[in-house]
Amino acid sequence: MSAQTANTASTPTSTVADRPGWAVLGPGGIARRFLSQLPASGGALVAAGSSSTERAQTFADEAAQLGFADVSAATYDEVLADPRVDAVYVSTVHTGHARLVLAALEAGKAVLCEKPLAPNHGTAMALADAARQAGLPLVEAFTYRFHPQTAALLDLVRDGVIGEVTHIDASFAFRTGERTGRLFDVDTAGGGILDVGGYPVTMAAAIVQAATGVAVAEPTELTATGTLGPTGVDEWTVAQLTYRGGITASVRTGVFVQDDNAVAVYGTRGRLLLADPWTLGADPTIEVHTVDEDPRTLSFAGEHPYAREADATTDALRAGAVEAAQMTIDESLATARTLDKWRAAIGLRYPFEAESADIPTVSGRPLRVQDGNPMQYGEIPGVGKRLSRLVMGVDNQPDLAHASAIFDLFVEQGGNVFDTGYIYGGGVLEGRLGKWIQNRGIREDVVVITKGAHTPFCDPESLTKQLLESLERQGTDYADIYMMHRDNPDIPVGEFVDVLDEHRRAGRIRVYGGSNWTPARFDEANAYARANGKHEFEVLSNHFGLAEAYDVPWDGCEHATDAASKAWLEERQVPLLPWSSQARGFFTGRATPEDTSDAELVRCYYSDENFERLRRARELGDRFGVPATAIALAYVLNQPFPTFPLFGPRTIAEARSSMTGLSVDLTPEQVAWLDLRD
């Protein structure tokens, strides 16, 4: 086996006259490794923060021995208020990361945060959003990502040296002596997956990205087995990952089993082998084995990866970026989702994130509506509360931590209306919403839309049974708005009106109406109500948006995109709570006349007229400086009848993108032009 040495010369990123000031928050073992290599960076340690001033002072004294003079030792808040600090390295226990990251960003500091960025994806989303809103770097400290060995590995994959990549094997596991300390404590998010499992996961993702050219790779399938020890954490686990395009990976981690801790990349023409790529000792190597060449070894001696990750963070700060190219925010979010799935596959959920947990805001502060938020508001007679014009759909949030993060963001941006249904998630999502409302103590500040009586249980008896069960799940005694999820024309409409009116008079419902009801049936219900002294239907929730619907996604749905329905809504002034106002992605850019891969999209929306609407939405979007999706939402908001469109963002980033439509005020002429009525 021949050996060759790679060129590992690095260029300093800053001068002594412009030397970024670093603070360490959480001066433990890994912080000392960071400190030991910081002299090789362009920065200098100026402060150490800890919950224990004694620990902070000990760390400052150690820094002085490395040549860092005048290092202050103080509390976290005092360190973040220090004007000498440009960037912070967060290295507390996993559960301490989030609040310190948020506090640092609010203080105007760049952040290098030890892995994992957060214990779960919901919390990680909030941190990513905070960095993007602040315009400051947030970098997850997977140290190996910043080492020349990793860059060389990805170049070898990208250049096709081993042909097409087929499989990746990566492991990081070690055996500790006793089941004590943070690694075995569920309250500090202990266990292998969160401590070191992110290393093989992020390595596999980086290799897939290099092999396929995508910016972020996330497994489409994940299966896993593992062992939960007596303290409740994962002590040993193996996961099998499959990526889009067919590349597979086997990843292993643990805190009570020693593994080889290596990476192997297999391709159609050979393989690449890395021994212990995580701790990055004095001379890490890559072995290159190909079918038509002698094996060779690349050597990467004399590097300081902790210094490199520090410089990458401050380089991003100077450039006005919110991330480092070596480990982007979107990669960190994909990693958090993957680790969530891995833990779920082996049945590991920490007590602080359980469905029954009192999960606080990520900052730990009380939830409040932010000043200068973009929300518009309206009224629906009988509700007794002001309603945000956007309605958060509660039909997709995978766990309480995720739901809490995205619901908190919605409220901070002025939102207060939530739409859920008896059938969503088998009832789990109603309970999830109710628990979040209970945790925040805001039942009288929010409007909850409850739906029930979906086919095949669309009858008065089932309506009552489901309503009572929905209220119990939500932990409340009333629904602000109740809507029948479907209609059943085989049952006289008066029977539905009678039972709904009964529940309203009993105080269980404040306002009621129908989802997926025809205008004719709606009118019939109200004619019966007037004739019999009952409360009328007051709200309708049908599909409505800029794109005209030629069919509906599911059986029993009704749309209101045709001219007759629009005229009826304008005449009656019935508040409409439209679902799928974005036409299931028609305005996102993925719909083109040539692309017929999505049969449902084609069936429901493809026509020359709708593609002309899309063209006009883009043209108007260019004028307003917003995407076509924002124009599509603005079209719904600017109708001559009251509208409260539902949206179901899967992430905080999607929620913010959707809300850009709130800033667009269309004239009646622009609304007509978009709808081809000019």
Question: PLM features: what roles do these ranges have?
Answer:
Residues 1-15, 87-89, 315-376:
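C-terminal helix-rich "cap/oligomerization" subdomain common to oxidoreductases
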Residues 19, 267-337, 351:
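C-terminal glycine/acidic-rich active-site capping loop/insertion
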Residues 2-3, 202-280, 313-316, 340, ...:
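Contiguous beta-strand/loop segments that form the cofactor/metal-binding neighborhood of enzyme cores
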Residues 239, 487, 491-678:
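Beta/alpha (TIM)-barrel catalytic core signal, keyed to glycine-rich beta->alpha loops juxtaposed to Asp/Glu
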Residues 146-222, 229:
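Predominantly a Rossmann-like dinucleotide-binding segment in NAD(P)-dependent oxidoreductases
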Residues 1-66:
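N-terminal Rossmann-like dinucleotide-binding module
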Residues 356-446, 505:
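N-terminal binding-site loop/beta-alpha segment at the start of enzyme catalytic domains
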Residues 87, 93-94, 98-145:
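Beta-strand-loop-alpha-helix segment that lines the small-molecule cofactor/substrate pocket
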